[in-house]
Amino acid sequence: MYPEESRGSGGVATVDFLEGTYDYAAPTPAPTPLYSHSTTGCYSAPLDAHGPLSDGSLQSLGSGPTSPLVFVPSSPRLSPFMHPPSHHYLETTSTPVYRSSHQPVPREDQCGTRDEAYSVGELGAGAGGFEMTKDTRFCAVCSDYASGYHYGVWSCEGCKAFFKRSIQGHNDYMCPATNQCTIDKNRRKSCQACRLRKCYEVGMMKGGMRKDRGRVLRREKRRACDRDKPAKDLPHTRASPQDGRKRAMSSSSTSGGGGRSSLNNMPPDQVLLLLQGAEPPILSSRQKMSRPYTEVTIMTLLTSMADKELVHMITWAKKLPGFLQLSLHDQVLLLESSWLEVLMIGLIWRSIQCPGKLIFAQDLILDRNEGTCVEGMAEIFDMLLATASRFRVLKLKPEEFVCLKAIILLNSGAFSFCTGTMEPLHDSAAVQHMLDTITDALIFHISHLGCSAQQQSRRQAQLLLLLSHIRHMSNKGMEHLYSMKCKNKVPLYDLLLEMLDAHRIHRPVKPFQSWSQGDRDSPTASSTSSSGGGGGDDEGASSAGSSSGPQGSHESPRRENLSRAPTGPGVLQYRGSHSDCTRIP
């Protein structure tokens, strides 16, 4: 305890203690304490109840400094002696005055001068705040401050370095969620897959800084224009690096000729970047099945995953450069002819780094032994694993994979007769042009691998020859899936069912009439046409009773009905039935 003594005018010492009761001695024989701990903050006696104060017993802190040893309790009102209504005791002038009013307190009330800091918020919301950020650039990926114009867009040092690392060599980023993670300044490191996807979406490209394409001159010209443009043009300036990418991926409202000219002017390296940016995410089955798997559980898991992947496959196809410029008929025909091949090459690509296993989803990894519980599945598993092993030996690059995947889709128009519709492409020249563009991009990538000309040609042939094996596996898988459908062992979802029926529907009347005229000679088709669908194999005979009439009574599919979302039932139907199981001869 540290007492502090002071002499009043009457010569009586007043002692203030840091602990215990606080006694203010009066000039009486027996000084009485005015308050204690129990009455602190709740004593409300009037000021004149104890008589006038002596001059030395208590003084206002406004008239002189207090000792640093005096303990000041935190209660707002100690007693009428400490806080009389007319004045604030134990308060220095530097302490802010707290009032119950909601109006802001000007600093003139306390210090006599106005504090300039109170107007910072007002200036920040006005013209002064804009002047501070007028020349500030933000990263197009994470919205952090941009350090420069990197890879075709304004970006920060972190996103620039991340994109540089990602485009060098093989990367297998996988999103742990739904490939829709938020990428900003604070969460840009949480998901590499979504960060790389956003880099492609905002227009980052590998050749964005190449001088031989004149990009440096265009960038300098753009910077010069930015300094002369008013503030209202700043959002357009930040989006300008994406103009070329938007023109290449224009919507279906653009005419076919415009889309074709944009493909002609698109360099191969940009085509590769667009193909990589269009890749769908790796999905999760989100179904918990106990092991060991049975035939029903495995087929349920696989058909459910296939239906989910079909939705993402349609989104992927729409992102291919020039695909939306095709007619709706051609888009549907290409997807119907190649959907299982596209899913299979994606499965093979995911399984390259895991020998002996097939990665259907992040939480659905099967080996060859687990596929033996399904009749006929082990053979398909063996072919998939063999193709994955071949790609592993060739050290398939991501750029080569996206090119092969797009080639499968576009080249399927030449085999559209497999769907049974016998309808040719409306604009086969546009499809062939897209196919040539992507093939050129594949050749461009192989030419930059540092191999000799002979090795480049050999590698290109080796990659393209593997596509025939994938088509063979697709046919096997289609047969197996269709047999599962006819046995009614597993439920098939709408989109998967429609895609499957597109390969198994009866052939329309007009193609058989053209065959009878000698345009297309096929003994099997002629016998089938003459028999009216009743002379097929056992499977066709078993389903003849479920048909609503002879084969000639079936109508050709109406493609105009496909303008709605592909997930609805009845996209490709004959008399609204999905029960036709007739095998195509």
Curated annotation (Swiss-Prot):
Location of the protein in the cell: Nucleus
The keyword Nucleus belongs to this UniProt entry's keyword annotation: yes
Pfam family, one: Oest_recep
Region (Disordered): 210-264, 511-585
Keyword terms: DNA-binding, Lipid-binding, Metal-binding, Nucleus, Receptor, Steroid-binding, Transcription, Transcription regulation, Zinc, Zinc-finger
Entry keyword annotation includes Iron: no
DNA-binding region of this protein: 139-204
UniProt-listed CDD domains: NR_DBD_ER (cd07171)
Residue ranges, annotated region (Modulating): 1-138
Spans annotated as Hinge: 205-266
Compositionally biased region (Low complexity): 541-553
GO MF, one example: zinc ion binding
Function of the molecule: The steroid hormones and their receptors are involved in the regulation of eukaryotic gene expression and affect cellular proliferation and differentiation in target tissues.
Xref: PANTHER family: KNIRPS-RELATED PROTEIN-RELATED
Comment field on protein domains: Composed of three domains: a modulating N-terminal domain, a DNA-binding domain and a C-terminal ligand-binding domain.
UniProt family annotation: Belongs to the nuclear hormone receptor family. NR3 subfamily.
Protein name, entry field: Estrogen receptor
Record gene name: esr1
